[in-house]
Amino acid sequence: MNKKVITRQDLTEASEKYKNWGKWGKDDEIGTLNFTSPDDIINAAKLVKKGKVISLALNFDNNGPQGAKTSYPAMGRTNPIHTMLRTGTDAYSGVLDHRGIRASDDMVVMPLQCGTQWDGLGHIFYEDSMWNGYDCREVTSAGAQKCGIEKTKSKMVGRGVLLDIPKVKEVDALEDGYGITCNDLEEAEKFHDVEIQKGDFVIVRTGQMEAKLKAGSWDGYPGGDAPGFSFETLDWIKEKEMAGLASDTWGCEVRPNESEKGINQPWHWIAIPIMGLTMGEIFYLKDLAEDCAEDNSYEFMFVAPALPITGAVGSPINPLAIK
């Protein structure tokens, strides 16, 4: 049976079917993050039973995935460049003794979406529009005048749920090019005895990152073929009313894309600017998956605020699962 190819007409229909513009008012700039209520956060805190904190981030260094061989151009993204401004050698030499202190200092230069990160609502446009109908030209050389990531700085806290698709299918990792379906996600909920609730942050493991790390090479990871969400999962996302969604791949959706030539990342076209979904990519999920399998609990408190960089369309993060 041939897979359906997503066309421009499909995108047009989806843009109306899944549109959340105006749902939280004409001035809204944070989209589905509105789904998380104060009570949701209180209840998420009650999930903490053993005081264990699990990071879902890769380290930010020159060993990251950017620059690896890939079928897709990097669009200027590099791994972080970390530079020391003052070192211990400087201190030993007495460079700052005249100021009465010995210290080190440093700086980093990096694309904001080069590692574990959130895609902000100013990142992807649907034709000439961004989230909530704002003109795409609101994102200027000075940054996003609307939907900047700083608008979310008191968000990204709530109940997290891990859906471990490879575990359900009894494989180490999903094959590159495998499109995760609504049925896969529903099966994972049942398998893990967990139900996605309104306002949740849903983390979906494919195993691809772990496969790359095990192989000792990121080749093919940034923009290459990958397992990921199929276009049909927009139905599931809409139904569940989740606050955010993240995965362990470079771009969340299945690659090669299911779309006709000329349409790149069709799932993104709808999820971000039309639905207002904040999306996490390049999440490191091995430790969380192992812990969830050990205690058979796939829900946890999730804390992953973006850096409030004014006008940014994405942000590096250190997401935490607290159990």
Indicate residue ranges for each PLM-predicted region.
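Active-/binding-site microenvironments in catalytic and ligand-binding cores
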Residues: 1-323
